[in-house]
Amino acid sequence: MDKMIKATVVVVDDDSMMREMLKLILRGEDYSVVGEASNGQDAITQCEKLKPDLVLLDIIMPKMDGLQALEEIHKVSPESIVLMVSADATMDKVAEAIKKGASGFVVKPLKAASVLDRIETILKARKKG
C-alpha cells in the first residue's frame, strides 16, 4: 500500500549538507521532496516548474538571497507556502520575511521536531483557510 504524501516540497539552501538533512527529515515523515536549489534564482525556476505545496527557503545565499526570491516565488507559484529557514533570525529579518509573504520562520541550527511541527501547523492553517 502506498503511503499518503502530506505535501510536495522544494528545499532551498546553499549548504548541500543542510539540503540533505532537510530532505531526510521530510521524507521520513511522508513529504515528497520534488526539487531543490542552492540559490534564489534556481529556487524561482524550480517553483515555477513544480508548483510545490511548500518551499523551505534559506535567506543567506549566493546570486539571489531568500528574501528577494520569496517575492518572485509568490509571483510564479502563488499557492506555494514558504517557510524561511535561516541562522539570521534578527527581528528585522523575521519581520521582513513575514511582510514579504513568508508563512513562518525556523531558526538554524535546526531540530527535526521543530521543523516538522512548524510545517504541520502551517499546512493545517492553510487547509482551514
Positions of PLM-derived features:
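Active-site beta3 strand of CheY-like receiver
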Residues: 50-56
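Acidic catalytic/metal-coordinating carboxylates
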Residues: 39-42, 65-68
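Two-component/phosphorelay signaling modules centered on CheY-like receiver
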Residues: 16-35
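C-terminal output helix
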Residues: 92, 110-120
